[in-house]
Amino acid sequence: SVICLYRDDTGIMWAGTYKNGINYYHESIFKFQTIRYPLELMRDIFNNDFNCIVEDKEGDLWIGTSGNGLLRYDRETGEYVRYRAGRESENAISGDVVISMAKDLDGKLWLGSYMEGLTGFDGKRFKHYRDIPGSKDGLSNNSVYSLYVDAKNRLWIGTLEGGLDCLDQSTGKWTYYRMGDKENAINSDIVYSLSGDEKGNIVVGTSLGVNWINPETGTVTSFNGTKDGRSVFEDQIINVVFCDSRQWVWIGSNHGLHIYDRLNDKMYRLNHSSGLPDNSIMSILEDKYHTVWVGTKNGLLNIVPNRDTDNNYTFDWNSYDENEGVQGRVFNVNSACGLETGELAFGGTNGLTFVDPARIRYNSYAPPAVITGLMVNNVPITAREAYDGHVILDKDITCTKQLKLNYTERNFSFTISSCCYFLPLKNKYAFKMEGFDSEWTTVSALERRITYTNLNPGTYTFKVKAMNNDRIWSKEITSLQITILPPFWATGWAIALYIIAGILLAYGVIRFIFRIQQKKLEEEQERATVRQQHEVDEMKLRFFTNVSHEFRTPLTLIMTPLEKLMKTEKDMESQQILKLIYRNADRLLKLVNQLLDFRKLDMQGDSLVLSTGDIVPFVRDVAY
């Protein structure tokens, strides 16, 4: 029982119950309606695996299932009528595994089954078409995977291994397109999906790519990418093809979604790396607002193209799951149908989901982001409690606008949250540390702890914003200014001391270099003086040497005649005079020879010869 109710500022209605906790509701949470076949009516196969859907002219839905046969659902009464395969009666569907359906221009239903052929139903009787060995006409394979009716009421039949068949209902003529044909061959005999463009061409999705078929000429072309060759289409197994109102072709595979803009010859690709919840694209439809809805193996998407100034497109999308009324996360291949009411119906492994674009209510509340926690060096920090000898927070982190951290505290984490409780797991967050990050980083609701390590000392601004379950971002950004103090060796006083020490060191180095240069200059000047003195001495010595050479020859010429005169002169007085002349001439010759010997010694041409002797006669000779 409900004992209290409360409606908050965001429009959520909270209900407090007796012994059963708290419940909440908002019209934007449950966006979709889902139907399932009642379990009490299932007598043999218990599942709601819906493979295909078609709406008849009365507005009833025909649903092909995996083992439960064909269901007719009356939306007004909510009642089901089930049609099962009957071996004993021809007026029944051909098989209980119905994997494809189509409605022709006459209102006739066509059912494709797994290994049981094709069935036509005019509202009264079922007519069966099977692959008859040896027959030139008729169905080429009993596993009919896809059906499509074109503008001329031709029925196109995609089979598992028989290629593509075309039945012209006005003439009863069958046309076949197969892999390996000499002309107009398709890529593969396994045809998974069919669609038609605005020109009447048939788009064929196979296990080996995509083909275009011109029904009037029978011409088959293979889709390899853009005409200019810049974007190449390489996916092989195609789950679904769909032509929209923009003349775009949407191609879904197990590797993501390709969108080909035929008018501008451009290709776009969306996959898990782009942000899609899953790469397996199963079904595609467009609503009246030109939003494209896509069933995947991990929820339902609505994709909105946005054109920029360069005529290129970007794509926004929302994903939905069972928490918002979707049948489940896994949708089936080609299990989608547009209804006369403007609704879309998507079948999956757990029922049928209706999408009514006109009635969907989106959550317009722009939730503010909140910083709810701080950790420093993996230690939780609380207000007014000391950490490492000082208090970091003087009030709760939620109310803090400025934060100072020591150099040893530059490894820190924030926990972020938002005040959006619609579907909190679908919230997203974007954060940026100005002064460190160059771009915003987006994270999911499961990644609410933001960590920074080893930031340099300085002032930063941490900014965070939140996105709600319907992709509405915060109007205001939550900011926190963070100052990381430098270590003691990087403070202003330390830097001033470093500058002074550097100046003194530079001065000492300059003085040292100056003294070395000055000493070198003095030594060079001294060497120049010595060199100059040596040159002067050398000049004098050369002069004396030359003069000595000039003296030596005349002295020799003087002494030789003197010797002869001394021998012939009889007069004692004259002889004494001659001896005096001879002795002084000899002395002068010895001095000349000594001067020449010194020159030889200086030129390293002679060596000093030492000898012993009586110095008295030597001195007497010199004196007298």
Predicted regions and their residues:
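Residue-level "micro-hotspots" composed of small/polar
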Residues: S1-Y6, Y18-N23, K31-V54, R87-S94, ...
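Residue-level detector of Asp-centered blade-edge/turn motifs that repeat once per structural unit
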Residues: R7-T10, E55-E58, K103-D106, V149-K152, ...
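Primarily the dimerization/phosphotransfer
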Residues: E522-K567, D597
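Short acidic helix/loop segment immediately C-terminal to the autophosphorylated histidine
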Residues: M566-S574
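Short alpha-helical segment of the dimerization/phosphotransfer core of two-component systems
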Residues: L580-L589
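Short alpha-helical N-box/ATP-lid segment at the N-terminus of the HATPase_c
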Residues: L589, N593-K600
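Helix-loop junction within the histidine kinase core
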Residues: R599-L610
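A conserved beta-strand-to-alpha-helix junction within the catalytic ATP-binding
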Residues: V609-Y624
